[in-house]
Amino acid sequence: MEFLFEYGLFFAKVATLLVAFVVVVSVVVGASQKNKYGEGRGHLEITPLNQQFEDLKDTMLIATTDESLQKAEEKKLTKAKKKLLSEQKKTAKNVSESDVTKRSKVYVLNFDGNISASAVGHLREEITAVLTQATPNDEVLLKLESAGGMVHSYGLASSQLDRLRKKNVPLTVCVDKVAASGGYMMACVADKILAAPFAIIGSIGVVAQMPNFNKVLKKNDVEFELLTAGEHKRTLTMFGENTEKGREKFIEELEETHQLFKEYVSTRRPQIDIDKIATGEIWYGSR
């Protein structure tokens, strides 16, 4: 009898472990299937700003009305909205689809950039969505904030804005705080840049920095080996002994990147003296 009890207890433990294993595997497989078939990619949130500002206007009107008259004002606004909605429905019946399409629209996007421009994926999807409807009569307004970062990441972000340019959709970039280096690479694509007086703009330059621990390793009798195939596979390293030849090659690559940056800006801003301003320095929006 005791044997049967112990056997049953052992069987219950094994069954519990098997169930737990199946649950874990199901979760992992489910997650991989979502990634494989593009589920869980997020969604676009589209907010009609006209209605938002109308609601704000009404709220302020009621808030600044004498308390004894607020209810009457609310009823008045509600009645006016119903009347306007009714008129719009009547008008809509007589308006052709082409007339609706001709109405100019402003699409407002946001880009808050970090060093790797990780928001570029969202920006790509947003611009794809806008381009399904936008025409040269419309406009895209991008609220941009970025101090720059990796060259290839911001090159990709800038190329997304170039898609609007190629479709002749006007682009305005608004800078409240900073659009420098890679951020300015994005901003220069725009037809117009609107910057706050003390917003930081520019920094058309390239920078690279790294520590070198080779002397520390030698001092502590630690050997470090770096094996490469290809003369310039590694130029400067953090742990190896850097050479003047490697340093010269690294600077050459920086200069080449800087030249590409200058060409990109001057193509989109032909009116500026690129050699004069592409010194890496920044300037303020009011300047």
Q: What is each PLM-predicted segment?
A:
Residues 20, 107, 183, 284-285:
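Generic detector of short, well-ordered, non-transmembrane alpha-helical segments enriched
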Residues 183-192, 197, 285-287:
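Active-site-proximal glycine-rich helix-loop-beta segment
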Residues 146-153, 172-185, 280:
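Gly/Ser-rich catalytic serine loop of serine hydrolases
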Residues 262-285:
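Secondary-structure end/capping motifs
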